[in-house]
Amino acid sequence: MERYKCRFCFKSFINGRALGGHMRSHMLTLSAERCVITGEAEEEVEERPSQLCDDDDDTESDASSSSGEFDNQKMNRLDDELEFDFAEDDDVESETESSRINPTRRRSKRTRKLGSFDFDFEKLTTSQPSELVAEPEHHSSASDTTTEEDLAFCLIMLSRDKWKQQKKKKQRVEEDETDHDSEDYKSSKSRGRFKCETCGKVFKSYQALGGHRASHKKNKACMTKTEQVETEYVLGVKEKKVHECPICFRVFTSGQALGGHKRSHGSNIGAGRGLSVSQIVQIEEEVSVKQRMIDLNLPAPNEEDETSLVFDEW
């Protein structure tokens, strides 16, 4: 019961319709009072004598205008409150009736009532509506332009950053590769083919070329080893001493064999100490001739034998 209560006389009513009829009576009385107040103000202005001083005229006009404005503002506020109460009561009644008749359409009716209430409220508080409507559109267009510009700028920056990152990655990959491999790759690559510089063979992929180069490296290693062995052998042969007998000019593989051979010459020389030098030379020549002769009855001597066979008849 407290909900349907008049704000002016504080009377309570059963429903909103009864309260609305009661509020209309208040509105009629208020409008009559407003007409009376405005009529009195006009009469006072007309009956005002013209011979008063300027100061008195100013003060009275200010007082009357201020009182008139105050009364008008008060009446406007009362009208707004009454109309707001009427709209609220009508909304409540329509909601209750719609819920009883058709509860499924409650949402749509509520939205319509809210829209009508907003429209009435805008009518009551109209103060340059065209300006109020035009300003948000201006702000929205500006915001749209700014957002589009920001998006375009962001896309440009992202594309630049991505390009820089790709460029840095490529530089890192190139730095990781050795200079030798990169030079070989560039020189060997011709029209999508990979050519070996040493033998001139062409391969379809860089991996095949790498395997082929490995074989070349192995061959080079073997060649270097054989060359080293040959050089060492030649140097060793040059460095070896020649063990040659000064008497019979026979060559021996070692100094020990040469020494034993010289002892044989010394024994012969010692046995013939009484002989002359010419005889000794003659004997040595005969020995050398005998050594040169080959006895077919004897087996052939081995080349690896360090000692030489001396055929003595004595």
Swiss-Prot record:
Name the coiled-coil region(s). Answer: none
Query: What SMART domains does the entry give?
Result: ZnF_C2H2
Example of a GO cellular component annotation carried by this entry: nucleus
Query: What InterPro entries does the record tag this protein with?
Result: ZAT1/4/9, Znf_C2H2_sf, Znf_C2H2_type
Q: Where is this region: Disordered?
A: 41-109, 166-188
Query: Which PROSITE patterns does the record cross-reference, listed alphabetically?
Result: ZINC_FINGER_C2H2_1, ZINC_FINGER_C2H2_2
PANTHER family for the chain: ZINC FINGER PROTEIN ZAT1-RELATED
Give the protein's function. Answer: Probable transcription factor that may be involved in stress responses.
State the name under which the record lists this protein. Zinc finger protein ZAT4
State the species of origin. Answer: Arabidopsis thaliana (Mouse-ear cress)
Q: What is the lineage of its organism?
A: Eukaryota, Viridiplantae, Streptophyta, Embryophyta, Tracheophyta
Gene behind the chain: ZAT4
